[in-house]
């Protein structure tokens, strides 16, 4: 059963392997429509989460080169000391009238134990983590007590699709269900195949073409 689900995940990932450029374009289009709808910045804020530092650096370069950098873009990642992180978090939590920051680009170093909900109810997962708990931790940065908006908007633009149905090849929700089932198997059985499990993120993101089951 594990092998069958992994084969299906691999198929979705392979169909989306060549869509990295469209994912970046989808992010830029979303930011333009939601944060600069008339060419001017509004008061909305968004958090962009990546799992890997390399992805973090890649999307940072794209954002900066398309008018979404400078004082509007803040970063949180594992390479920052606690002392360096505090003013960044404070700027993002401050009123939009007092702080120009509108986009927070973060790795999972910022996904646990940090409150970011004061003036933000939008979050984008650039990469879907293998462990669903990590995704829940990310969402919990804004989906928590103290959130002032009625809705919290979460987007997974893995294939550069629209915000209503973004996914790997249109299968984002299927992937999440499969991952949760695999995680449940690990809880019930003690583990998922130790050779297959570490390859999951690569399959989902398309960086692996096939599973090595040796």
Place the predicted regions along the sequence by residue.
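Conserved Helicase C-terminal RecA-like lobe
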Residues: 1-102
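Conserved nucleotide-binding/hydrolysis micro-motifs of P-loop NTPases
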Residues: 53-56, 80-82, 109-112, 128-132, ...
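Short, surface-exposed basic-aromatic patches at helix termini and helix-loop junctions that form
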Residues: 62-68, 121-122, 144-147
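SF2 helicase motor core recognition
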Residues: 104-120, 139-147
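A short beta-strand element within the Helicase C-terminal
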Residues: 114-128, 152-156
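Conserved SF2 helicase motif VI
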Residues: 131-154
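C-terminal accessory region of SF2 helicases/translocases
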Residues: 149-214
